[in-house]
Amino acid sequence: MSQSKADYINVIGAGLAGSEAAYQIAKRGIPVKLYEMRGVKATPQHKTTNFAELVCSNSFRGDSLTNAVGLLKEEMRRLDSIIMRNGEAHRVPAGGAMAVDREGYAEAVTAEIESHPLIEVIRKEITEIPDDAITVIASGPLTSDALAEKIHELNGGDGFYFYDAAAPIVDKATIDMNKVYLKSRYDKGEAAYLNCPMTKEEFMAFYEALTTAEEAPLNSFEKEKYFEGCMPIEVMAKRGIKTMLYGPMKPVGLEYPEDYMGPRDGDFKTPYAVVQLRQDNAAGSLYNIVGFQTHLKWGEQKRVFQMIPGLENAEFVRYGVMHRNSYMDSPNLLKQTFQSKSNPNLFFAGQMTGVEGYVESAASGLVAGINAARLFKGEDEVIFPHTTAIGSLPYYVTHAESKHFQPMNVNFGIIKELEGPRIRDKKERYEKIAERALKDLQTFIDA
């Protein structure tokens, strides 16, 4: 155990992880200096200066406890996550998923943090790793070059990276509603998605256009390394037609409504392929194209995506873009507390640690913030149970094989297995894992 003599803790970056870390520290009665460069220096992806901005999708993904990210969200709610609380307050319809009005949510997080009496917000770019106090670095995958260089020095000069992309957003008023229908897959939850059905002929023409469209160039010295969970649609398409039909354009569970009058293949009750649109703001005026992260040139996006039935005259309020994400060699550099092995006063959180996804990033900030606060108070740091979703993430990123380490979403495969004979039914098995996780988390909280 080591601790600083300073009477505050630094948090660098006010994204999901940094906002969560700052809140967790401050609620434990410790002053925080929260540094955020947006407002002074922009990033390629962020559109506002709000904290915890969502730059890719507006979805926090599945809400069911039989979904690992649903379990993680419930654990975070029980740990008083500022991200989850404000996300809940700004939900928009998304069937069985949790999606938010991205502007209202980010504005609420920003207002709560800026008004907190123990959090001092400093709009400034940090170019060196501070040594004046316990510090949580949560500068994100878009960390500025100067600070990224210092972090890479901790990596022994090695920088890991991958690319991910954001999906386009369209103005609902410009969608041809006669060609689409409202439905959630398998009718789960409320009918929350606009579905753009395709016949086989329409799909094949779209597929041909997508796979031959011109992509925006990458730097010539960088390989195209993508995170599977946010892969550009054109890259996915080049893997083959079935990748699309079993992936983002899967038609199963999205049968035509009885009053559907558009084109279809014969008497089939289900389209050959479906493109889904998900509500992106509380007003319901914007919709994003689900799973259509892309790196196509903007003119090509307009040409190809207007081939989607219902989007022939759609106005794109934001085109899809791709950005480079950097992450650390966490298995060699970090403890399960998200603490540096070489400097106990230094913590890291967010996607740079190798957790992937909004919820996972916020969860890492929660863990790092709690442990930074405990270190400040002279208490032992805590390791969350491996039987929980929030404990499985730091376990994974610090125990993975360094040579093949890549960012990871939360999933039941990284949570400690149940004891006893394996339960064959997947839903029942996941229910038991979730039940054990919440029980163990409560025991951990009460200890």
Swiss-Prot record:
Residues involved in FAD binding: 13-18
Gene3D superfamilies noted in UniProt: FAD/NAD(P)-binding domain (3.50.50.60)
Keywords: Cytoplasm, FAD, Flavoprotein, Methyltransferase, NAD, NADP, Transferase, tRNA processing
Cofactors named for this entry: FAD
Single GO biological process annotation from the record: tRNA wobble uridine modification
Main location: cytoplasm
Pfam families: GIDA (PF01134)
GO MF assignments: flavin adenine dinucleotide binding; tRNA (uracil(54)-C5)-methyltransferase activity, 5,10-methylenetetrahydrofolate-dependent
Location in the cell: Cytoplasm
Similarity field: Belongs to the MnmG family. TrmFO subfamily.
UniProt function note: Catalyzes the folate-dependent formation of 5-methyl-uridine at position 54 (M-5-U54) in all tRNAs.
Protein name: Methylenetetrahydrofolate--tRNA-(uracil-5-)-methyltransferase TrmFO
Chain's gene name: trmFO
